[in-house]
Amino acid sequence: MARETPMNPVRRISTRRLATVLSVAAAALLMVSAPASADPVPVATDYGGGCVIDPANRAATVDALRFRCSPEQQDAVFKASPRGAVPSGVKNGWVTRPPVMQALAPALWIGKTFYTGPDGGWLMNRVTAAGIEAWRADIYTAPALIDGAPTWALNYAPSPTPQVYDEIREVSPGVWFGYSWWRGGLQTTLLLAFVLA
């Protein structure tokens, strides 16, 4: 009958220690290589001179578009943005250019109320400080006049000023930037640029 040799106690401890070290190393490797469960933090885009579009800060984005972005930077922001989601509900609005309209607009226009679904809908402008709803526009996707890429078209054909045509893009979550155009007989002219939030 063969006799079993007992394992050396020093060797038994070393085997246990090795198993523990390997288990800890495997757990650490799994934690390091495991995918993150949190959503990535959106990154702000800095166009220079304080013109920063920050997806995590709606108020800072509106402030930048109103007071810090040059017309060229505003155009770059618009061109770099996808069409985005269509606005829904009451949105405050501010004219960003030209300066004379930026100063006059708050007495005449304070935003828009959107009645929309995922593919568009219609809106009413909020006019005067009382927010009276007027000047209906139909909303649908169309190529932007400025670059031909998809945009939300705000067509004022059903309003008293059918020559007016706006286009907007969601430049940051909950913030839309766009242009208001006058469609004349011979040419289409930019009237102003505006932001909604």
Name each region found by the language model.
Residues 3-38:
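Secretory targeting and sorting signals
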Residues 40-172, 176-197:
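Soluble ligand-binding/transfer domains with enclosed cavities or grooves
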